[in-house]
Amino acid sequence: MSRSAGSFLILNGKSADNEILRGSVKLLRDQGHPIEVRVTWEKGDAARYVSEAADQGAQTVIAAGGDGTINEVAAALAGVTQEKRPALGLLPLGTANDFATSAAVPDDIELALKLAIEGRAVPIDIAHVNDKTWFINMATGGFGTRITTETPERLKAALGGVSYLIHGLMRMDALKADRCEIRGENFHWQGDALVIGIGNGRQAGGGQELCPEALINDGLLHLRIFTGEELLPALFTTLTQPEESPNIIDGASPWFEITAPHEITFNLDGEPLSGQHFRIVVEPGALQCRLPPDCPLLK
């Protein structure tokens, strides 16, 4: 497979029976685009397929699935040497598709696949956590993380992103702030946080825009902390009038360190990571990604 033409499509196994996708792949193949398809079955498959694609000189690796699939593919690409690293394409097929949605990737499968193959590749940032794992979109901690990690799969499948909100309302009795300390470049905060969002991208949890100013090619991570001792009033004000909420703290830095006196959990593009200390560092321009020319996440 030549670097000038070939694409590997790594498809989440949950979407393997998608007939529209099958037809779109055939159409683009008929138009002269070589496309290899690989279907994931278990954790680690995507990384193996990325390695295979790089060894074969693929031009693009397309992550076909939700935010978790994009995360796994992007993390694997970050581990490929730069001279062999294919570009990343996005084909949103998940429940919420937060990263692809905020990047203005088309919902239409054929259009998204065409963009993933033919679109202009631009350098984008990715974030490294504790020198062992990655996220391309967002790390969220606190109550919001518990909701997204605990939301039942059937509810997500039936209602999409709205399911996170509904499940959250059902779990209001579990609202509990996390005490922590957060440091960054020219930033320091300590207190009780209901939700922490550290964004390379802008939205998480099924469409909640936690870091509205974030860009994926500015070399920065954007931080938003939702605070408040009276949690229900704070949450209501934050959701209805965010520009007026005294319970929002914002920051931006190439890195952030979070420490807590007890174990807290961060959700990294859907993957939970627990601990008492997190160091999150942006890797500027680490990946090439095929995005729309009007992508709002690019400066």
Swiss-Prot record:
Protein's UniProt name: Probable lipid kinase YegS-like
Gene Ontology CC: cytoplasm; plasma membrane
Gene Ontology terms describing biological process: phospholipid biosynthetic process
The record's free-text note on cofactor binding: Binds 1 Mg(2+) ion per subunit. Ca(2+) may be able to substitute.
Ranges for domain DAGKc: 2-133
Cofactors required: Mg(2+); Ca(2+)
Binding-site residues for Mg(2+), renumbered to this chain: 215, 218, 220
Family: Belongs to the diacylglycerol/lipid kinase family. YegS lipid kinase subfamily.
SUPFAM superfamilies: NAD kinase/diacylglycerol kinase-like (SSF111331)
Binding site for ATP: 40, 66-72, 95
Role noted for this protein: Probably phosphorylates lipids; the in vivo substrate is unknown.
This enzyme's EC code(s): 2.7.1.-
InterPro entries linked: ATP-NAD_kinase_N, Diacylglycerol/lipid_kinase, Diacylglycerol_kinase_cat_dom, Lip_kinase_YegS, Lipid_Phosphate_FormReg, NAD/diacylglycerol_kinase_sf, YegS/DAGK_C
Gene Ontology molecular function: ATP binding; lipid kinase activity; magnesium ion binding
Location in or out of the cell: Cytoplasm
Active-site residues, as the UniProt record annotates them: 271 (proton acceptor)
Key words, A-Z: ATP-binding, Cytoplasm, Kinase, Lipid biosynthesis, Lipid metabolism, Magnesium, Metal-binding, Nucleotide-binding, Phospholipid biosynthesis, Phospholipid metabolism, Transferase
